[in-house]
Amino acid sequence: QGWVVFVPHTLPGEKVRARIFRNDKSHSQADLVEVLVPSSDRLEPKCSLFGKCGGCQYQHLSYEKQLAWKTRQVEELLAHMAGVETDVSPAIPSPKQWGYRSKITPHFKRPRDGKIGDIGFLLAGQRSHLVDVPHCPIAMDMNTGRK
């Protein structure tokens, strides 16, 4: 029908059940409810909080496919936003796929009644709800488990 629905954490070619939460002029935004027919590229994410915690977007995709996807995103953004049609050099792979992030940004709720508020990462798609993340596989060890 030509109508675009953006559903995070889905892959091209998948059939999914999604819940639309916003309709704009040219597209809708939806939450993923269930993957009905998965892509052959779909992997089991390393982090059990993938899809809940808003920190990662691509753990369900092999690293090689992540690099190709990121390269394609740069090409499409240059074409769409700047009107530049060009081949982009492939994304350079990192020697570390896990434990590489040296900066993480935990959020916290304001203390109430003398009690320390929750500390965690923002729930995917939210600005005020937190997810407790006892261990983050992409963060360096020095950044995990701090409360």
Predicted segments with their positions:
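Accessory RNA-recognition modules of RNA-modification enzymes
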Residues: 1-147
